């Protein structure tokens, strides 16, 4: 099911807009993550999609149908919350089958459907157990199966991995991706964890301060951020940011003068600072002093002093710790310039111009 927002605004108190003029389309059959800091509008957006909230203004469409005034029951979406909300007195089988029981589906039919879903989420060997006897990952699988019981056109997941340990989070994000692909259901996944979003999503919507900062594929977010917020929010380690003026002399032959005059902040990915000449991929060269270096396994990093600014490079393999000063090169990929408003004015696709 395709989901479309047209000029959607949401205000809880009638004074301050939690969401302002949201316009987007989520294609049918895709997995989209809503990513951003706390208070950015992720859960509010999800609740508007589900029908738990009604927008202050604007329209919401499922396919070509206007569902703006339809409640959650009428929209027929499946939801999985952070706490799973399973029924502890019921077996796994009856938890999965519960929505079908409420819909007056016969026992044999609902149990057959529940068993099929249990196989899909890999809990078919746990059907007779109470949910309290399950691990966190198993409980989440049951919650997803229950959400799929009525064959929803949309599956909504609100921070579903936050209660799991690091190993289980990795395992379960891959399972969610597998389940989504096998069912083909349009899935919307809310998270504040960029690693989850980058690994699981077809597309990511970055939300902050109630507005969409960028809505694109994970790779595009990283390679072509719309603005400084996205550049800093996406990527690990966090992108190096320094005043553009500190680089102006070394960029004079690589960046048009008109752009340099507008540039306020330079963003440089740590892998875009290299200690060797990469030929045509090089944008600029500078001389820097290594103030600290670290090597662990295949990872070699260095803190570099450049005109009084600190830069981190993660491409220092093969560089001797006895070389405190040397020439560094900035690659075209991973370098960006932003203006006073934070908008991207150079970098990403602009290198091809």
Functional labels for PLM-detected ranges:
Residues 1-5, 9-21, 69-71, 104:
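A short, flexible loop at the N-terminus of ABC-type nucleotide-binding domains that lies
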Residues 35-37:
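The feature captures the beta-strand-to-loop junction immediately N-terminal to the Walker
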Residues 43-46, 142:
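ABC ATPase nucleotide-binding domain helices that frame the ATP-binding cleft
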Residues 50:
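Helix-to-loop junction immediately C-terminal to a conserved catalytic motif
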Residues 58-66:
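Conserved ABC transporter NBD signature motif
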Residues 72-78, 82, 86-227:
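ABC ATPase nucleotide-binding domains
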Residues 237, 249-353:
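Non-catalytic connector elements of ABC transporters
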């Amino acid at each position: 099911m395709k989901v479309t927002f047209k000029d959607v605004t949401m205000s809880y108190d009638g004074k301050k807009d939690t969401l302002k003029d949201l316009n987007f389309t989520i294609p049918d059959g895709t997995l989209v993550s809503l990513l951003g800091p706390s208070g950015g509008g992720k859960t509010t957006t999800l609740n508007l999609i589900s029908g738990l909230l009604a927008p202050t203004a604007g329209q919401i469409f499922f396919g070509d149908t206007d569902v703006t005034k339809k409640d959650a029951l009428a929209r027929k979406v499946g939801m999985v919350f952070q706490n799973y909300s399973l029924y502890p007195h019921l077996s796994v089988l009856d938890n999965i089958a519960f929505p079908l029981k409420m819909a007056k589906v016969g026992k044999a039919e609902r149990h057959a459907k529940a068993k099929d879903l249990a196989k899909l989420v890999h809990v078919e060997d746990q059907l007779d157990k109470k949910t309290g006897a399950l691990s966190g990952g198993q409980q989440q699988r049951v919650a997803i199966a229950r959400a799929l019981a009525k064959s929803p056109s949309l599956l909504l997941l609100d921070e579903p991995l936050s209660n799991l340990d690091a190993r289980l989070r990795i395992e379960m994000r891959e399972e969610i991706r597998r389940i989504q692909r096998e069912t083909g259901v349009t899935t919307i996944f809310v998270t504040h964890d960029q690693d989850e979003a980058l690994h699981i999503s077809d597309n990511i919507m970055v939300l902050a301060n109630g507005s969409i900062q960028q809505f694109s594929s994970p790779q595009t977010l990283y390679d072509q951020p719309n603005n400084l917020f996205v550049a800093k929010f996406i990527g690990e380690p966090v992108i190096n940011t320094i005043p553009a003026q500190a680089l102006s002399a070394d960029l004079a032959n690589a960046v048009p003068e008109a752009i340099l005059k507008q540039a306020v902040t330079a963003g440089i990915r740590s892998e875009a600072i290299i200690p060797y000449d990469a030929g045509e991929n090089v944008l600029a060269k500078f001389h820097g002093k290594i103030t600290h270096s670290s090597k662990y396994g295949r990872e070699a990093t260095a803190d570099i002093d450049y005109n009084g600014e600190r830069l981190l490079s993660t491409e220092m393999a093969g560089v001797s710790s006895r070389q405190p000063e040397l020439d560094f090169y900035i690659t075209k990929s991973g370098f960006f310039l932003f203006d006073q408003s934070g908008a991207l004015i150079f970098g990403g696709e602009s290198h091809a111009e």
